[in-house]
């Protein structure tokens, strides 16, 4: 499947600092954030005009699920648009706090852990064909996903009883299973719950919940692009060396703690391989695969950055990727800060900087400051991100959903939508079932809109 439906779900961390007045619980802060949403959507679980879903998840975490996208740049734009949507809620909530005399600064973090040790996720979704062995997909994908943090982790300072250490991944310490149908209880690498949000006879949805939330556009593109390409190769019958891991959960932590990528992890049958070895194998197969597939500049860009990052890890010279990969950008930032101020990695100021990197408020968040200074590479533009806040992808089912929502809201009509249903809540209860996520034109939807 060379044209694939993809999406990213991001849970955001929330905190609020108060100006000497009464403190609010995380639940209360979340309610302030979503008050405007509830006022027009009558719920804290809504679909937006750009086709995305916005809702309050377990533990008072705002979650933004992008609309269905069918290319990587489009997906990065819509992922970044989610930050803008949440930033608008943040600004609105701060104004409400001020009006009510509470006063405080709300922070939304696009990260995966808080100071209390809780974890919240960034989930990738890929449409796959129902035909074929799902077990083969998970078998081949698992070693890739365990070691993928080497090329696209968000980076984190982990405080241990012995000392502070820099890790590749924020999520690695919180994953407890390889493949499972649960998401919160056991936190698997791949979630197998069968909810295709499409024609179940043709498709299923691969739900990857091991990834970090990325600030860098290049890292997001690399994270999703490499996974999509490995999926494509599995479907095309490409053979890979057997890297079945003896203990994926131990391996994911070992990989996260080793920025050299050279620490051996134990494979099934007693063999060993490093994260760098495993990623090199997948990358080599990808380079070969590109010779036999239709040219795609975005995929070529992904494979080029993948190779460049592996070279950087191998030589430990990160100069060629230090504006593109989150954990590399972050580590360089920490090292400069330590050199300037003489701090140890365990210093609370470093932990503060770690958190501030993920602050999504423009002008305040550290990543945004780096971006404004030209110290991180862009692959999108502000204009296309702003457009994605209100406009759905024009090449997928999201276009139908977005147009329906816009028309219903402008006509003042009561409606209900989810990923596959568009329903007018009138006497006739007219509903259109959109089971094909690739389809962006549908006469049934056009008739429903025309009838408003």
Curated annotation (Swiss-Prot):
Q: Name one GO molecular function term.
A: ligase activity, forming carbon-nitrogen bonds
EC class, as a word, reads ligase
Please, which domain of life does this record's source organism belong to? Bacteria
Report the active site residues. 57 (proton acceptor)
Catalyzed chemical reaction(s): ATP + [prokaryotic ubiquitin-like protein]-L-glutamate + [protein]-L-lysine = ADP + phosphate + N(6)-([prokaryotic ubiquitin-like protein]-gamma-L-glutamyl)-[protein]-L-lysine
Q: Which UniProt keywords apply?
A: ATP-binding, Ligase, Magnesium, Metal-binding, Nucleotide-binding, Ubl conjugation pathway
Question: Which pathway is this protein engaged in?
Answer: Protein degradation; proteasomal Pup-dependent pathway; Protein modification; protein pupylation
A single GO BP term for this record reads:
protein pupylation
Specify whether Magnesium is a keyword of the entry.
yes
Q: Where does Mg(2+) bind?
A: 9, 55, 63
Residues annotated to bind ATP? 53, 66, 419
Q: What is its EC number?
A: 6.3.1.19
Function description: Catalyzes the covalent attachment of the prokaryotic ubiquitin-like protein modifier Pup to the proteasomal substrate proteins, thereby targeting them for proteasomal degradation. This tagging system is termed pupylation. The ligation reaction involves the side-chain carboxylate of the C-terminal glutamate of Pup and the side-chain amino group of a substrate lysine.
Further details from the record: The reaction mechanism probably proceeds via the activation of Pup by phosphorylation of its C-terminal glutamate, which is then subject to nucleophilic attack by the substrate lysine, resulting in an isopeptide bond and the release of phosphate as a good leaving group.
Q: Which family does it belong to?
A: Belongs to the Pup ligase/Pup deamidase family. Pup-conjugating enzyme subfamily.
Output this protein's name.
Answer: Pup--protein ligase 1
The gene is pafA1
